């Protein structure tokens, strides 16, 4: 690595040390998609990005191991995650199935009422023709004209009833879908509460941390890009941390960590990485629970696109559940090496 890149790396490390929490750093290092998004936002050359990742692995390892009490807490998180995740996974899979079944039911009723409305409209048209025909023939064929007139009016009434019935059926179905979504929301409250109480005061703002992860990643990348440009163009000014952009969302309550820039950067051990992943898994679980049970759009009003909303939520929930399953596999005994 050339001397200029070494200076850049030191500046980057200072920024991560001062402005990025341990949880954010661990998630960035354990999520390849997040890392690639960060590298793209920061506009880092590949060799520089690789060196930075090695240095950040060492920094993260130091942050994880520095506080033994915190390390013990991570071990507790790991054990809790291993114990509770299978049950939570079954519950979440059940919610995914219910969301998809509900979406399918909403779609079927919507298709059925649409077809029925088409039929009722056709009947209504026929009613109009027969009624007009009956009125037109009245002066010439009294008996037949009254039959046609009565038939036309009867069909018209039937069509009106059919149209109203279809509208009522679809409305009732949507209201029921809304109620079921509300029940999902309420049934998940206790699970979310238990998980949040377990994590406790050690992880403030955890939902915000996960919900805003994409924005956080992009923000970190933009700040690193600004640092790089400032270093490459001294006239832009020296590096100054921009705390108002990212802030420090940290379970350690703002604990400052020792600067690690000396010596060759070494990769963090798999054992240390997955211990941190346990805490990250719990944070993501909170986000998954929130995603599964929060039904704002449905509760604000079930519209024709409510089935798509349900499908989208189920798909997003399934993707995050798959990621959590991978973390659970990483945390299995014998995977520390």
UniProtKB/Swiss-Prot annotation:
Protein name: Apolipoprotein L2
Residue list for modification Phosphoserine: 250
Protein species of origin: Homo sapiens
Entries under InterPro entries matching the protein: ApoL
Record flagged with keyword tRNA processing: no
N-acetylmethionine PTM positions: 1
Function comment: May affect the movement of lipids in the cytoplasm or allow the binding of lipids to organelles.
GO cellular component: endoplasmic reticulum membrane; extracellular region; membrane
Protein's cellular compartments: Cytoplasm
Stated family: Belongs to the apolipoprotein L family.
Domain of life from the UniProt record: Eukaryota
One annotated GO molecular function: lipid binding
Tissue and organ distribution: Widely expressed; the highest levels are found in lung, thymus, pancreas, placenta, adult brain and prostate; also detected in spleen, liver, kidney, colon, small intestine, uterus, spinal cord, adrenal gland, salivary gland, trachea, mammary gland, skeletal muscle, testis and fetal brain and liver.
A GO biological-process term: lipid metabolic process
Keywords: Acetylation, Cytoplasm, Lipid transport, Phosphoprotein, Transport
Entry keyword Phosphoprotein: yes
